[in-house]
Amino acid sequence: MNKSEKTKAKILKEAKKLFWNYGYSNVSVRQIAKTAKVDAALISRYYLSKLNLFKTTIGSFDWVHDFDINDDNIIDVYTGWLLESMDMKDETTVVKMLIMNSSDPVVGDLVKDINIKKMRKPILKKLKKVSPLQYDLMISAFIGISQTRKTLKMPTLTSLKKAQYEKILKHIFKGATTFKS
């Protein structure tokens, strides 16, 4: 990897952390440049614009292509994702990106559209017993508990041990995926 490729990769890495943790509109090009320890002009040179850089960070996530999700393991897969990110530090996960950017005035619609096209629709195609409503209820619980723990920092949730948190997640997700309308 030559110097310009390394610089471009460093910009992408730092932009992803900032965009996904703080939201697109809350992050400036100067802030990205400062964090990446590069001149701000290099962002325009390599990515043309802040928006293109953001789109590149989203494109760097593989969405559902690597996820073996089916009716029998969906609860375990989603529980595992939240258990992997139990610490309270900033994180670069797709959950955090969705939470921080789906209501953004500039990129919100883009993020929602990508989530539907690259996450929801492909996963629903893999499910036979879990209905679209049940899946959406589970996602609501998934994002809700993540927000409540990480953003609102509710003491009873932030102090949970991994085994307790896992039990709660499975209980909530089972309730969502077995809901009868």
Residue ranges and their predicted role:
Residues 50-55, 63:
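Short, solvent-exposed alpha-helical "recognition" segments
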